[in-house]
């Protein structure tokens, strides 16, 4: 995992841009000027630690160059295929495999790889720069475009520091979105003219004409709209376990030490169990909280003790929160209010002392159906059929009673899962202060992923997979872990696993409405029913850590101008 950056303006400061992302790549920095474009790279050495794995990397004739952030899984098979076609390799890195795959198949190479990636390819043969982002949005990729000047970077701060001739203007609609859903939804960023390349998308920039000629999707997830049982559960369990095992074994490959995050929840327990099977010396890292209502630590400890795992742990306290709160702007260069970012940073900091790579359970809820609001909507639909108007009823009641009745707020949090949005109650005031047009509707970015004909749980899973997962969860993990130069991998988000789960009927995936029912059944004996079949807690900090009852986004909003880098 690394930091990448590039642009077409010769006056920009590429050294400053890449230096501010050194935390993403402390093992070396390189800037390369090319005709019409510049690439920069900050390296975190994971595969092929030698100089041969350094980037930017170029083809044998120097016509094509690449900078790449992420990992390609199972790339050895692709490498063998390319060697049979006559390609020679001078490193053991996956970067060189991508480069030669592009030379062989052009832009279609991206359909042949699986992994987490943000890729930029410079091609003198047609004088273009092509960007590619992984299917789920695991790796970030920002770009700036004003109609002629174009640049990209792994983080927003890279864009801002590189584009030293630009006066950046805050996008008030992004602030408005943030105040409603606690993060800035893709493709927006905090600033106008700066965007994020959407997951599963490619972009082509014409260097000569200084314009973006393509921004399109290269992958479409097929979703099963059936509700009833279609396949025998034993067959599904066998296939699921094979895919989980395969994904974890592929993602354990590295030339540096690998560990796992173990929260005690369903997903991290399964990932850690399979990682331990692959390597009994794997280190696990866990967080505990002083408030037992937020602690799952005893479940993590139980699993670690059962399999004699190497467990490392730390307690996250209120003083830790106070200490790290003001540092949040260092990790997230735009407003972000997911409070689990704090313990994620601390567990990453602890892990980095022993390993360079960790596997996490992120994505399991979206892929296998694990959020509590899914179950509520499943029950509502079974009782009453589709009940979309219920959202409006609850929303109106919350606005009237927000200071009196916290039941309505809890109800809204659950019911909002149907759309995947959690509106803040000060909407009218926010619109006024931010000068937001009356016609602007925050839900527009989600409507493109709202598929009415899908069963309730599947519908919500798909929405969250496309919005909440890349916008919040994966952003949180990437920034918190990379702040300490730790690579996080997410085996439950492999292409094969995502496509497998969404190819199932809802009943096969969540039998009788049991959240993650198939996944839990597959690991009952190894993980234990007491860990698998209990109320979901989530990975968040106690609300008592805040000074008052303001929402996290309002706490962070008071410092919003500090995000002007």
Question: Model features per residue range: what roles?
Answer:
Residues 128-129, 139-140, 160, 366-370, ...:
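Short catalytic/ligand-binding loop motif for oxyanion handling, primarily in non-cytosolic enzymes
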Residues 28, 140, 268, 364, ...:
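Short hydrophobic/aromatic residue motifs in ordered secondary structure
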Residues 135, 147, 346-405, 468, ...:
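Active-site adenylate/phosphate-handling loop in enzymes that bind or generate adenylated species
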Residues 1, 108, 167, 193-194, ...:
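Adenosyl-5′-phosphate
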Residues 1-326, 330-332, 344, 348, ...:
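Cysteine-centered catalytic environments shared across enzyme families
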Residues 326-330, 352, 374-376, 546-548:
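Short low-complexity, flexible loop/linker segments enriched in glycine and/or proline
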Residues 335-338:
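Acceptor-substrate binding/catalytic loop of class I
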